Amino acid sequence: MDQHQHLNKTAESASSEKKKTRRCNGFKMFLAALSFSYIAKALGGIIMKISITQIERRFDISSSLAGLIDGSFEIGNLLVIVFVSYFGSKLHRPKLIGIGCLLMGTGSILTSLPHFFMGYYRYSKETNIDPSENSTSNLPNCLINQMLSLNRTPSEIIERGCVKESGSHMWIYVFMGNMLRGIGETPIVPLGISYIDDFAKEGHSSLYLGTVNVMGMTGLVFAFMLGSLFAKMYVDIGYVDLSTIRITPKDSRWVGAWWLGFLVSGIVSIISSIPFFFLPLNPNKPQKERKVSLFLHVLKTNDKRNQIANLTNRRKYITKNVTGFFQSLKSILTNPLYVIFVIFTLLHMSSYIASLTYIIKMVEQQYGWSASKTNFLLGVLALPAVAIGMFSGGYIIKKFKLSLVGLAKLAFCSATVHLLSQVLYFFLICESKSVAGLTLTYDGNSPVRSHVDVPLSYCNSECNCDESQWEPVCGNNGITYLSPCLAGCKSSSGNKEPIVFYNCSCVEVIGLQNKNYSAHLGECPRDDACTRKSYVYFVIQVLDAFLCAVGLTSYSVLVIRIVQPELKALAIGFHSMIMRSLGGILVPIYFGALIDTTCMKWSTNSCGARGACRIYNSTYLGRAFFGLKVALIFPVLVLLTVFIFVVRKKSHGKDTKVLENERQVMDEANLEFLNDSEHFVPSAEEQ
């Protein structure tokens, strides 16, 4: 008898061990798959952000339209967020995440497809009708009393080239691909977090969530490194002879291999989807048990009485839920602390979203840095500063057990640092370049009041130049000219590197003592003073990134503490919806429209319509961009002051229900911080 009991115990122990091993292995596989999907998610998101300027140039569109394309991700996300939030927990979560990753990858690949159907990139459309010929032999010189065949009028360009550019609306595919990526990314975070929270060992959820978010951070670094590499590559690499390409990555017309980034991220996303289709709905149950449960469920649902009862109960349940939803929504919208919180976080995050979207354009126009260099420094310096700042902020909150007032003060410090950094940037704005025909007269002797319709000078009036051309050359006098023809250059060194133009009459007007009236291809570089400002600018960016990330961690905890526990999920969801709709969608559009107002020279596409901007007034651009950011951040300080005042007033009054449970929700708040941290990271990683 004893031996029989011993054998039974041994068998039960072995069975228990097998179940634990099966559960552990299934959960570990899910954790590994989710970590990989976080890497894919981060890769796709950052590739889009750092490619937006290149997309703008490739498709010859304005910054505001490029901002709309960037915001299409949030549009896609909003289309399905309600469906995923409601039905996600009732369906097979791993498979739903796998479908999301598959859609995310498909969207990224769709985004890259226009590259293969648009033909070769023509960076000099005004002077070059054949898209396969970007060689230096097509550069226009000044031929007095003669009309160059290459200097065609706009009507000739339209007649011969407009039909060839029938793919000018291919940006719509980029829009749709980015929207599809937004749809696909929706289930990854909420369903992944809930799965971990349901099946992780008690007390281990925070550790697992931290691990997943760290993997997401590595994806961000990887994305910036890839972006830096692809930005160096010419867009048509592998299709054209690169020795004939006369522009460099510092040229405002340069377009890197933007499509490669989307191809890579798309493939990675599709690969990341595969493991989820082989994971169980519940890692605690073996396959046989799940099949039996499913069979019993089918038998029950075949019972007509049960169906009628279930239908009646379901109607009551839905009615109760709808009524409860609107009551809950009314409750959070009549909570003054929550309303103030939503407004100031929207304003604060809008500033970060604008910076992330347009930082490459800003640095390029202000300091002449290439996109490749900017991406590299962001990935190596700014992004780690954000990561360290966020973990430091979480540590400070937990170590000092900050109250609601303490969290608000931490957020106030973050906003103050960000505001001061924007004010400092005003002193780091470089003067606009000296460009004949835009900021100076063509002879280079006098500034102009407006860059519109600057009259020709006697040094180039007989050259029969096309004033719409943008083929900049830098004269020995330090002035940039719109083209060799408008500089009055009579000859060139041909295809030899570097390309030099000689006998430039507009350069001669300045009266150089060495009589070397020449110009070389490309815009004139920034002076040493501006270069020094660029280094100071980036140091402030990194410090701002760290200090602001420390404060931004308080937002994830604040949203939990200011509402009742049962309204937490709704409060977070509504806040996320506002951030996406009014922040993620609108901010790139209205900041892009503001940037467009500072453009001095627009390209003209083959149909005679306005294309992408070639050069901005860097002074006006800096003032407008940083000025709008200051206008967004200053009200944040005012609202945070009001927030702190209201909290203190409540803490001394009778209504202390919101504050009573602060200590009890600390662990839960830290868990939610790990859940929501990726929502704040992309908006701050360049700061």
From Swiss-Prot:
This is SLCO1B3-SLCO1B7 readthrough transcript protein. One of its GO terms (molecular function) is sodium-independent organic anion transmembrane transporter activity. Transport activity is induced by farnesoid X receptor (FXR) agonists such as chenodeoxycholate. The record marks 467-468 as: Reactive bond. Mediates the Na(+)-independent uptake of organic anions. Transports the conjugated steroids 17-beta-glucuronosyl estradiol (17beta-estradiol 17-O-(beta-D-glucuronate) or E2G) and dehydroepiandrosterone 3-sulfate (DHEAS) at the smooth endoplasmic reticulum membrane (SER), granting access to metabolizing enzymes. Contributes to the metabolism of bile acids such as taurocholate (cholyltaurine) and lithocholate, by functioning as a doorway between SER and cytosol, thereby decreasing their circulating levels and protecting the organism from their detergent properties. Disulfide bonds join 459-489, 465-485, 474-506. It is a multi-pass membrane protein. It comes from Homo sapiens. Glycans are attached at residues 134, 151, 503, 516, 617. The keyword Transmembrane applies. The keyword Hydrolase does not apply. Residues 453-508 form the Kazal-like domain. Expressed in the perivenular areas (centrilobular) of the liver (at protein level). Keywords: Cell membrane, Disulfide bond, Endoplasmic reticulum, Glycoprotein, Lipid transport, Membrane, Protease inhibitor, Serine protease inhibitor, Transmembrane, Transmembrane helix, Transport. Belongs to the organo anion transporter (TC 2.A.60) family. Residues 1-29, 85-96, 192-206, 280-339, 398-409, 561-568, 646-687 are cytoplasmic. Gene3D superfamilies: 3.30.60.30, MFS general substrate transporter like domains. One of its GO terms (cellular component) is smooth endoplasmic reticulum membrane. Residues 51-63, 118-170, 228-258, 361-376, 431-539, 590-624 are extracellular. It catalyses: 17beta-estradiol 17-O-(beta-D-glucuronate)(out) = 17beta-estradiol 17-O-(beta-D-glucuronate)(in); dehydroepiandrosterone 3-sulfate(out) = dehydroepiandrosterone 3-sulfate(in); taurocholate(out) = taurocholate(in); lithocholate(out) = lithocholate(in). PROSITE patterns: KAZAL_2, MFS. One of its GO terms (biological process) is bile acid and bile salt transport. It is found in: Smooth endoplasmic reticulum membrane; Cell membrane; Endoplasmic reticulum membrane. Based on a naturally occurring readthrough transcript which produces an SLCO1B3-SLCO1B7 fusion protein where the first five exons originate from SLCO1B3, while SLCO1B7 provides the remaining exons. The resulting mRNA encodes for a functional transporter SLCO1B3-SLCO1B7.
